[in-house]
């Protein structure tokens, strides 16, 4: 996937124009006769709001598609567009990237993890968090049966208490 390469090419010099947030991957739903698909899942589209630094953000899909998934759309409403701090937790260009970013003017952290064709499993230390502080992580992830081609809108939302001593397992 090109989204695991862009952070090492176009994003090297600073922010870029990138518009994630597509919730309907089947292009024929809006344009009959167009059989192409967006090679992504809904949860991956959310992760791109964090992994792709683009401080002028918008929602890329039509309102009707967001109305079907309001719990996932909440992330788009909440995610900041500018950051005070960014940490590249792990990366292999063309394979995977996991980034943690601290929202501008707050202590709120956001993580995004995305992978190429082979997927990726992470076991991440959260030692960048403020020691002694407790956080509630809201995790938007692909469901077990999610696949960009057959089930791109299968996702889960879970919450978990974490601290700077916690580890977080992610699958992209």
Q: Where does each model-flagged region fall?
A:
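Glycan-recognition surfaces
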Residues: 1-63, 90-91
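Structured core elements
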Residues: 17, 47-52, 99, 110-113, ...
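Acidic/polar loop patches that form or flank catalytic/metal-binding clefts of enzymes
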Residues: 18-19, 57-70, 76, 83-87, ...
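Active/binding-pocket-proximal capping segment
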Residues: 66-72, 117-118, 127-145
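Edge strands and adjacent loops of beta-rich recognition modules
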Residues: 73-103
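Carbohydrate-binding surface patches
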Residues: 93-131, 135
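Acidic, Ser/Thr/Pro-rich beta/coil linker or hinge segments at domain junctions
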Residues: 138-160
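C-terminal beta-strand-rich structural cap/linker in extracellular carbohydrate-active enzymes
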Residues: 158-172
């Amino acid at each position: 996937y090109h989204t695991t390469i862009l952070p090492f090419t176009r994003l090297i010099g600073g922010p870029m124009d990138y518009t994630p947030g597509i919730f309907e991957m089947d292009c024929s739903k809006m344009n009959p006769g167009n059989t192409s698909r967006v090679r992504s899942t809904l949860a991956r589209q959310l992760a791109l709001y964090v992994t792709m630094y683009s401080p002028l953000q918008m929602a890329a899909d039509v309102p009707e598609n967001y109305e079907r998934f309001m719990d996932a759309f909440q992330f788009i409403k909440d995610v900041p567009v500018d950051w005070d701090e960014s940490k590249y937790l792990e990366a292999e260009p063309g394979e995977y990237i996991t980034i943690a970013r601290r929202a501008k003017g707050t202590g709120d952290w956001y993580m995004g993890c995305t992978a190429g064709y082979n997927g990726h499993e992470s076991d991440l230390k959260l030692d960048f968090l403020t020691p002694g502080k407790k956080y509630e992580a809201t995790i938007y992830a692909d469901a077990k049966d999610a696949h960009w081609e057959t089930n791109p809108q299968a996702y889960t939302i879970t919450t978990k208490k974490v601290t700077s001593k916690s580890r977080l397992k992610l699958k992209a």
